[in-house]
Every structure is written in C-alpha cells, then in structure tokens.
Curated annotation (Swiss-Prot):
A motif ('HIGH' region) lies at residues 11-21. InterPro entries: aa-tRNA-synth_I_cd-bd (IPR045462), aa-tRNA-synth_I_codon-bd_sub2 (IPR020751), aa-tRNA-synth_I_CS (IPR001412), aa_tRNA-synth_I_cd-bd_sf (IPR008925), Glu-tRNA-ligase_bac/mito (IPR004527), Glu/Gln-tRNA-synth (IPR000924), Glu/Gln-tRNA-synth_Ib_cat-dom (IPR020058), GluQ/Sye (IPR049940). Belongs to the class-I aminoacyl-tRNA synthetase family. Glutamate--tRNA ligase type 1 subfamily. The gene is gltX2. ATP binds at residue 241. It catalyses: tRNA(Glu) + L-glutamate + ATP = L-glutamyl-tRNA(Glu) + AMP + diphosphate. This is Glutamate--tRNA ligase 2. Monomer. It comes from Ehrlichia chaffeensis (strain ATCC CRL-10679 / Arkansas). Keywords: Aminoacyl-tRNA synthetase, ATP-binding, Cytoplasm, Ligase, Nucleotide-binding, Protein biosynthesis. It is an enzyme of class 6 (ligase). GO terms for cellular component: cytosol. CDD domains: GluRS_core. One of its GO terms (molecular function) is zinc ion binding. Disulfide bonds: none annotated.
C-alpha cells in the first residue's frame, strides 16, 4: 500500500451537498483511507455572489453526518487568490500565456459567425503572437495552448483519453477584473496541496484535458485522474433538476440513516463481488478504483429503503428512540413524559422491523404515546361500529386479570375464551383489540402491544371504544 496518497473533495458552496457530490467525497475518502493516505477538503468559494457561509456550514455538516472526516484544516480557495494571480503572471513571463485585449463584443460577434456556419468555436486571438503590452486597456490573460497534436491521459476508470488540441482553446486564466478562473485556481491549489489522485464525475473530462495544458505549461506533474460515471434517475435518464435539488440534509430530514446513505452511494458505480450490505470498515479494506464501473449508476429508492430498514434494525433501540422522539414531539406538540417513552422503547423492537425511515417509524409509533381518545382510522372505526357489543365483554374479562398475570399466556387464553363464548372468530376479536388499542389494523402483534402498554392503558382505550356512538 502507498503511504503518500492524497485525495481531495472540492465542492463549491453555491448549493447544498447532493448525492453526486457526496458520492465523490466518499470515493475520494475511501481511496485515501484504503491507501493509508490523506483526504483533504477544499471549499471553492471564489464565486462570492453565489457562495455563502450558511452553505459552507451545510456542506461540512452533511459530511460530518455521513461520517466522512477530512484531514487537516479546510482550505478556502478564496484565500489563495494572490497565489493564483502570481502563477498567471509567471506564465506570462515564461511566454506560456499572453495578454488578450479582445473585447467581449468582438468575441461574441466571432461566436455568432461560427454558429451560423455550424462550426466549432475556438477563439483565434490576434494578440497571441504580439510581444508588447498596452497600458490602461482592458485585458485578460490567456494560456498559450498548442495548436497541433493531442492531449491524452490514462484515466483510472476509462483508460486512455485523448483530445485533439484543435478542440482546446486558449483558455482565460485571469479575467479582466484580475480574478483567476476556475481552471487555473484548481490546478494551482491541487499542486500546492500535493494532491496525488482526483476522483470526480465524467462531466469534468473536458476540464481535465484543459487543466493538463496548464500543468504542462507550468512543468508540474499532474495528479492521477479517475472519472466516475454520473448518477441517472430510475429510468436511466440524466437527473432532472428536481432530483438534483435533493440535498443530503433532506435525506436526513426524511429519516434516512447516514450508514444507509453511505452504503447506497458506495454501490452506485462501485462493487465488491455480490455484496450489497457493506460497512465502511469493509469498504476501506476493499475499495479499489478498478471496481468502479463505466456505466451510469441509477437511483433506486427501493434499495435505499431496504438499506435504511437494515441499518435501523441493527441500531440499538435506545439510540433509535432518541432519534424519533424529536419527530414525535414536533408532530404532537408537546414533550413526552417518561411513561410514554417507556411504552415507545418497549415497542420499538417490533416496529423497527417494518419501517422505511425514521419519520415513518415515528408515525407508526404514535399510538404508543397518544392519550385517549387516540386517532382511529376509517377501517378501525368500521370494526368498532360492527362489533359494538364485543367491547364491554372485552373490558370486563380483561379487567379481571391481575397486573402480575398481564402476560402473553394469560392474555392469549382469555381472548380465546371470549371468542368461544361469543362464537366469533378469534381473528375478529383480535381485530377489535387492534381497532380500539392501536386505532388501525396494520400493526405488530397486538398481544405484544398490550403487554407493552400495560393493563391500565389498554382498558382505557377499550372503554373509550365501547362508548363511541
């Protein structure tokens, strides 16, 4: 294993961290950890109009929630602008770049002419070969790109990538307002941070070819690149703006566990044999770029629900309880007392097995914490109405059981006797208990629920059902 691998994640704080960015961060982190290397975080905050402190915090918090820790201090790209400008001027001195005095109007007119002819536009600057400067005239610094040959690199996912230099223009390095462009800033920062490997989406392939021209001009060794296929929707189409707008913080608010998201993202484009459920410790041990596929990954909400259910089931009941209490309290509008929390804790083991997410679990658990009258759905209301005469008998028989005898065996035999005495199917008696105690038919074992809620609370609910007109 290499001990000098350094990867990075370099988000722009113009939006929240989304699935694609989170996967990029995860893959870079895993590759670094697999190789006993370092994973660095750089915030590319040079777009001051769209960047904000709130979005920077949102990205950092999302990474922390996903348990993707970075090494060292966060690098803010905006702090390095003077260094970027210095490099642009160095390229001028070395005749690897030149001043371009063409106006925006001239360039736009040129673009229109190329567009009308259906030709690929590449700015052919008249200033490229002039060796003098003009003071007090608006100018930019452009890279002196080669006009012949090819730019190629060995992509660790796709193999050899070759781009004709005729397709690569003399890119702007420094704007007329003396601000560096993205392409220059990224190259300088990656070099200064000693980045050895960059894993990013295939939408950066053209950027990589252009950045390699800058590396060549500076005579710097470029990092190794691995471009990962983009994420598509369930139908195999490019993600719509609606899908792209779903941030990691929103998945958190929906009640998805970070372990589930990480496992889900890991399997989006990367595989290890036929394993679906993979812990992060296993992922660090197994991660290899050669196991990243070339086909776009697809969103699969069913798989995410499956993984989330798995990790919720593995998590200790007390931990899950503390996660869902705020959701429940927000819904009901008051704080739960210790008795209600006790009911919840007892019932969580069974409820966890059935849930998709924490919000769903909180909603499914509400019957444990509701006061009489509890919420009763339409199906349960119909059963209460149809079996009105049963509830007084249920109440009388169940109230005769002592508190110490309120257990599975006694409750089961009592319900069986009621069924036989009334000549009603035992399943219908259980329906009556579900309707009155839970308020719905879809719930775990009613006997277990009755034991968890205890006798007094169950009798209150049965009594209420008995008196419903």
């Amino acid at each position: 294993m290499s001990h000098n691998v350094i990867t990075r994640f370099a988000p722009s704080p113009t939006g929240h961290l989304h699935l694609g960015g989170a996967r990029t961060a995860l893959f870079n982190w895993l590759y670094a950890k697999h190789n006993n290397g370092k994973f660095l975080l750089r915030i590319e905050d040079t777009d001051k109009k769209r960047s904000s402190k709130e979005l920077i915090d949102s990205i950092i918090n999302a990474m922390s929630w996903l348990k993707i820790p970075y090494d060292g201090e966060i690098v803010l790209q905006s702090k390095n602008i003077s260094r970027h400008i210095e490099i642009a001027n160095q390229l001028i001195l070395n005749n690897k770049a030149y001043y371009c005095y063409c106006s925006e109007e001239e360039i736009n007119k040129e673009k229109e002419e190329f567009s009308k002819k259906g030709l690929y536009y590449k700015h052919n600057c008249i200033w490229k070969n002039k060796n003098f400067t003009i003071d007090n005239l608006t100018r930019v610094i452009r890279l002196r790109s080669p006009t012949e040959g090819v730019t190629s690199f060995d992509d660790k996912v796709y193999g050899n990538i070759t781009v004709s230099n005729t397709q690569l223009d003399d890119m702007v390095l420094l704007r007329s307002d003396n601000t560096p462009t993205y392409l220059l800033s990224v190259v300088v920062d990656d070099h200064d941070m000693n980045i050895t490997h960059i894993i990013r989406g295939t939408d950066h392939l053209t950027n990589t070819a252009r950045q390699l021209l800058i590396y060549n001009a500076l005579e710097w060794n470029p990092p190794k690149f691995a471009h990962i296929p983009l994420i598509h929707d369930e139908d195999g189409n490019k993600l719509s703006k609606r899908h792209q707008a779903i941030g990691i913080h929103e998945y958190k608010n929906l009640g998805i566990l970070p372990e589930a998201i990480s496992n889900y993202l890991l399997r989006m484009g990367w595989s290890h044999e036929d394993d679906e459920i993979i812990s992060m410790d296993q992922a660090i041990k197994w991660f290899s770029i050669k196991n990243i596929g070339q086909s776009p990954a697809r969103l699969d909400n069913k798989k995410l629900e499956f993984l989330n259910n798995h990790y919720i089931s593995l998590t200790e009941d007390e931990v899950i309880l503390n996660m869902i209490i705020p959701i429940i309290e927000k819904k009901i509008g008051y704080m739960l007392n210790e008795v209600k929390k006790g009911y919840l804790l007892k019932g969580l083991y069974e409820l966890k097995k059935r849930t998709k997410n924490l919000v769903n679990l909180a909603n499914e658990s509400l019957f444990y914490v509701e006061d009489v009258p509890i919420s009763i759905d339409q199906e349960a209301s119909a059963i209460i109405k149809d079996y009105k005469h049963v509830f007084s008998i249920l109440y009388n028989n169940l109230s005769r059981i002592s508190e110490k005898e309120w257990n599975n065996s006694i409750l089961t035999s009592t319900i069986k006797n009621i069924s036989q005495n009334l000549d009603i199917k035992i399943s219908n008696i259980y329906h009556c208990l579900r309707a009155s105690i839970v308020g719905r038919m879809n719930a775990p074992s009613i006997i277990e629920i009755m034991i968890n809620l205890q006798q007094e609370e169950c009798l209150k609910r049965i009594k209420y059902a008995q008196n419903i007109e």
